[in-house]
Amino acid sequence: GQKTGFFLDQKYNRLAMQRICKGKKVLDCFTHMGTFALNAGIAGAVDVTGLDISEYAVSQAEANARLNHLENNVHFRQANVLDELPKLAQTGEKYDVVILDPPAFTKSREATKNAIKGYREINMKGLKLVKDGGYLATCSCSHFMTQELLAKTVKEAAKATHKRLRQVEFRTQAPDHPILWAADESYYLKFFIFQVVDEK
């Protein structure tokens, strides 16, 4: 991976996704090694697509699918997510579950304003692909993007795409990545699961 190879801080969030993926059509964006996609497949998702810009990551994800005997229903494709999602929307593609696990859009306080635009954009693009009554899982791994700020940004994305959100779950990093109250930067991972309903 870009840092650690498997991102163990997300391990329980992947398990949480299993509860809503059985029998579903799933899109995993920024899939990297395919870990969210594979967990969806293990849970019984009928059709899973993982997207990542890295050719190497996609090859590793495909190998992981084969190792887990999931190659029949879990597939990966090299693509720039920001470009690919609008193309999928134009063709009328819809998913029961869309997962957004982007790399950190900001690593400094000064860049937070631009990061907010990035998170808003990717969530708008993702929301357009969620079926009425489906689910969006979205997260940020930057400690500068606080829980409140991420929630506000996703809410703005929902308003812009005429969607209503029902928060199903809020999660953070695994316990072996402890949050130290004396070190703000230790609280970096925020993970929301929303049910998405079209505005009537």
Which residues are covered by each model-predicted region?
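Glycine-rich adenosyl-nucleotide cofactor-binding module
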Residues: G1-G44
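Short helix-capping segments at alpha-helix termini
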Residues: G44, R66-E71, K159-R164
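Conserved SAM-binding motif I beta-strand of class I
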Residues: D47-D52
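S-adenosyl-L-methionine
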Residues: Y56-I99
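Helix-to-beta-strand junctions that scaffold the AdoMet/dcAdoMet cofactor pocket
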Residues: L70, V130-D132
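Mobile active-site "lid"/loop adjacent to the S-adenosyl-L-methionine
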Residues: Y95-K125
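C-terminal catalytic and target-recognition region of SAM-dependent MTase-like enzymes
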Residues: E121, Y135-K200
